[in-house]
């Protein structure tokens, strides 16, 4: 359960950058102490909040960060493509570990627990609820259910070819519909993040470009190698 009121959390992240501190799975940076250090560095650098995956990572980060934390659990399930916080037990554990906001998959795909049940459990635990959506219809449905934040997180990640650019249109449409919008997904440069805010996002989350060192190094390595061709 968050120690901050819901209105305080939303005001604190409004107009700012949230940093997703999710290292490459099983990579050398994938350690709770390192995740906590990433979160601290992100706040020092100007982030208004962080997004943390995993209960152990959250437990390591919460004592080090007073800024709002968006928390998730990712699971690979044999019976569902839904990965983000699929079970009610995940919500309970994240709340107990100090999450301010708990995000769940808000797509219309088959899942072990209904979206509305997840929403009710998040609110019962005293946390804000965020829906990671892929389309306008999903976002509007989750808004109508009562989710506090609608994220464009899943746009481009539910099948088909992965787009290169962020989904600015989804951000714009969600905001026009009255949602509190978290722009997320492929915002890999300051210019792209700025554009999200100009499209109406309330805040923007950036991950790989800031906290996945392997990805960043590979971008530079490929560019350097291409100069030899």
Swiss-Prot record:
Tell me the name of the encoding gene: nanE
What this protein catalyses is: an N-acyl-D-glucosamine 6-phosphate = an N-acyl-D-mannosamine 6-phosphate
Protein family according to the UniProt entry: Belongs to the NanE family.
User: Can the keyword Isomerase be found in this entry's annotation?
Assistant: yes
Q: What PANTHER family does the record tag this protein with?
A: N-ACETYLMANNOSAMINE-6-PHOSPHATE 2-EPIMERASE-RELATED (PTHR36204:SF1)
GO molecular function annotation: N-acylglucosamine-6-phosphate 2-epimerase activity
Q: Which domain of life is it from?
A: Bacteria
Return the broad EC class: isomerase
Pfam families given for it?
A: NanE (PF04131)
InterPro entries in the cross-refs: Aldolase_TIM, NanE, RibuloseP-bd_barrel
Asked whether the keyword Isomerase is assigned, the reply is: yes
Write down the Gene3D superfamilies for this protein, in alphabetical order: Aldolase class I
Pathway field of the UniProt record reads: Amino-sugar metabolism; N-acetylneuraminate degradation; D-fructose 6-phosphate from N-acetylneuraminate: step 3/5
Matching entries from NCBIfam families are given as: PRK01130.1
- Give the EC number(s) under which this enzyme is classified: 5.1.3.9
Biological process (GO) annotations?
carbohydrate metabolic process; N-acetylmannosamine catabolic process; N-acetylneuraminate catabolic process
Tell me a GO cellular component.
Answer: cytosol
Q: Give the protein's recorded name.
A: Putative N-acetylmannosamine-6-phosphate 2-epimerase
* UniProt KW keywords: Carbohydrate metabolism, Isomerase
**Organism of this sequence:** Haemophilus ducreyi (strain 35000HP / ATCC 700724)
Q: Name the job this protein performs.
A: Converts N-acetylmannosamine-6-phosphate (ManNAc-6-P) to N-acetylglucosamine-6-phosphate (GlcNAc-6-P).
